[in-house]
Amino acid sequence: MQLNTRQARIFKLANLLGTGKPVSAADIITSLECSEPTLTRALKELRESYSAEIKYSKAGHSYHLVNPGQLDKKTLRRMNEALAQNAELKTGESTGKVVLDKDKKTAVSLSLRMRILRKIDRLAALSGSTRSEAVEKLALHSVDELIKEYSAKKS
């Protein structure tokens, strides 16, 4: 099962605090790669979801799991296994790039006879595309042909 970012963060936090020793806030933030407000939300979720009692020490600027609630050794082990599986899934994923850039298009106004417009609409219907896509295909094909024709005449 693949974990979402929030789940992975909470599982990591549970494992960090599961040792029973105080853990500094800086170490937790570094390990979870998150901000202080995000850490606060993750601690709240851990307290609420697992009935865990987590104390904050101002002197040491650290957190300590005082009462684990439902975070017993078995639950922590399962969380650790889920994190390991999640890490394996992430390394196995393809690292191909996705390009989300669109071709830059410019709106063009054309004055066409109805006969030509009906032919363009028919081409769009036959090719399963929009009128704009049909005009683009038509223009691309025709312009390429005309360029070849005029290039041949000049040579």
Curated annotation (Swiss-Prot):
Role played: Involved in tellurite resistance. TerW binds specifically to the potential promoter region of the terZABCDE operon and probably regulates expression of the genes.
UniProt keyword annotation of tRNA-binding present: no
GO terms assigned for molecular function: DNA binding
Domain of life: Bacteria
Stored Gene3D superfamilies: Winged helix-like DNA-binding domain superfamily/Winged helix DNA-binding domain
Protein name as catalogued: Probable tellurium resistance transcriptional regulator TerW
Keyword set includes Protein biosynthesis: no
Keywords noted in UniProt: DNA-binding, Plasmid, Tellurium resistance, Transcription, Transcription regulation
Induction behaviour: Expression is not influenced by the presence of potassium tellurite or hydrogen peroxide.
GO biological process, one term: response to tellurium ion
